[in-house]
Amino acid sequence: MASGFKKPSAASTGQKRKVAPKPELTEDQKQEVREAFDLFDVDGSGTIDAKELKVAMRALGFEPRKEEMKKMISEVDREGTGKISFNDFLAVMTQKMSEKDTKEEILKAFRLFDDDETGKISFKNLKRVANELGENLTDEELQEMIDEADRDGDGEVNEEEFLRIMKKTSLY
């Protein structure tokens, strides 16, 4: 039985929820996605099948893994028809393309830290960037930052570790 009691929303309880901006594609990117979709929609039905999804994604420069494909298909093909509409394909590709942009932005930041091009961020690299940014951090605080991100215990932060920590902290 439904009652008149309404669960308080995050807004009404004074809590702030972080809402990520909805990824958007440029008109050129949308056109590129449309062309890839149309290439595989040979019968002009407005749908492609699940197998063609992977090929269409490859045509756009993505190499989805098997588990990733299964997850995407289950998300867009809720009725289990094996057919994917252009709008569903566009939604998947918008997400994928924004993730790719994010990764590229994070790696750009990584290269700014890694000025000696060792492929790793050392304590010295981190200290230099902190000083350039005018951050007054102690050596202990800087070392804690390295230790937090350093998974393989080599005392430095490689690209993979940097990507992980940046995504974990939701800075990107």
Swiss-Prot record:
Extract the SMART domains matched here. EFh
Q: Which GO terms describe its molecular function?
A: calcium ion binding; G-protein beta/gamma-subunit complex binding; heterotrimeric G-protein binding; microtubule binding
Query: Which key words tag this protein in UniProt?
Result: Calcium, Cell cycle, Cell division, Cell projection, Cytoplasm, Cytoskeleton, Metal-binding, Mitosis, Repeat
Q: Name one Pfam family in it.
A: EF-hand_7
Example GO biological process:
centriole replication
Record localization: Cytoplasm, Cytoskeleton, Microtubule organizing center, Centrosome; Cell projection, Cilium
Disulfide-linked positions? none
Residues forming the EF-hand domain are 28-63, 64-99, 101-136, 137-172
Q: Where is region (Disordered) located?
A: 1-31
Q: Does the keyword Metal-binding apply?
A: yes
State where Ca(2+) 2 binds.
150, 152, 154, 156, 161
What sections of the protein cross the membrane? none
Entry GO terms, CC = centriole; centrosome; cytosol; nucleus; photoreceptor connecting cilium; spindle pole
Give yes or no: UniProt keyword Cell cycle. yes
Write down the superkingdom of origin: Eukaryota
The record lists Ca(2+) 1 as bound by 41, 43, 45, 47, 52
Kindly state the subunit structure of this protein. Answer: Monomer. Interacts with CIMAP3. Interacts with USP49.
Remaining remarks: Binds two moles of calcium per mole of protein.
Family from the record: Belongs to the centrin family.
Q: What does this protein do?
A: Plays a fundamental role in microtubule-organizing center structure and function. Plays a role in sperm cilia formation.
The molecule here is called Centrin-1
* Species lineage: Eukaryota, Metazoa, Chordata, Craniata, Vertebrata
Q: Which gene encodes it?
A: CETN1
